[in-house]
Amino acid sequence: MTTSTDTTPILFPAYEHPIKMVVCDLDGTLVQSDLNVSDAVLDTIQAVSQAGVKVVIATGRMFPSALPYVKRLGLDTPVICYQGAIVRDSQADFALRYSNPVPLDLAKEIVGYCQSQGIHINVYVNDVLHSQPHDIYVDEYKRTSSIEPVLLDDVLSILQADAPPKMVVINNDPAVLEAVRGYLLETYGAERIGVCKSRHNFLELTAPDVSKWSAVVALAEQWGILPQEVMCLGDEENDVAMLAGDGLGLAMANGPLAVQRKAKGIVPHILEDGAAQAMRHYVLAK
């Protein structure tokens, strides 16, 4: 069950259940704008792990982009990536635990529409990013993700056999993103395509039942952990499902107010190591 609070956010709200699993978004939650993770966050996550609490990364990033951070944080837990469309082991052969891609025919239609409108769209297939050349967004995406894209004049050509776990429309004009969102939901409906923002200029497209929270619940169940025993930390629209779920959902103070209002409470700004403060408050101080 997912609840919607829409109330004034409370800093460090009281919570009665023990925390046995901590789920963290990356960008804007653990990873700062300079792409670094503070020593306080690193040290706190290691202490939480050593206390026997599961720490899991749940990100919109593709697996190869998330894995270096998982390693740096010293985690050996599975990685929830592509907004929850893929869950992979972070050890050994990176075994695929779960996959729920966008249906291939639907992906083709959406990519065809974006290309016909001159709208940038990233397509992810088999952990490889495919994008258009000569595009102002390519270099910026490479910088923030540390991923080298395969550049194709016709991105549609990659959608032959394997369906993408997600696609991302990128545009610095919010009106363009909202127009694309409106078109997709009007044309296909929320029952066929999932649409949410992960950054101010990223519109994420997934299968409709994909979310970080659904992947979190599935992992927690495998470990015998109740949803109420999970703490989730995030900052953007793509985190709302897990912030409003049955666990302790805490929004970063640096995130949009609309996101904060969906959470159980808030924690300080990322530059104040809000995620680390939350873990110390709800896990290490108990």
What kind of feature is each model-predicted range?
Residues V41, A66-V70, V180, L184, ...:
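Hydrophobic packing residues within well-ordered alpha-helices of enzyme cores
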Residues L73-L75, Y82-Q83, E191, G245-D246, ...:
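Short, structured coil segments at secondary-structure junctions
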Residues Q117-H120, Y124-L233, E237, M242:
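Conserved acidic, metal-coordinating active-site core of Asp-based
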Residues F12-P13, H17-M21, S38, L203-K286:
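Mg2+-dependent phosphoryl-transfer enzymes with acidic/Ser/Thr/Gly-rich catalytic loops
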Residues N36-V138:
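Active-site phosphate-binding/coordination module
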Residues V48, T59, Q83, M167, ...:
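Residue-level signal for inorganic ion chemistry
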Residues M1-C24, Q46:
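Non-catalytic pre-domain segments flanking phosphatase-related domains
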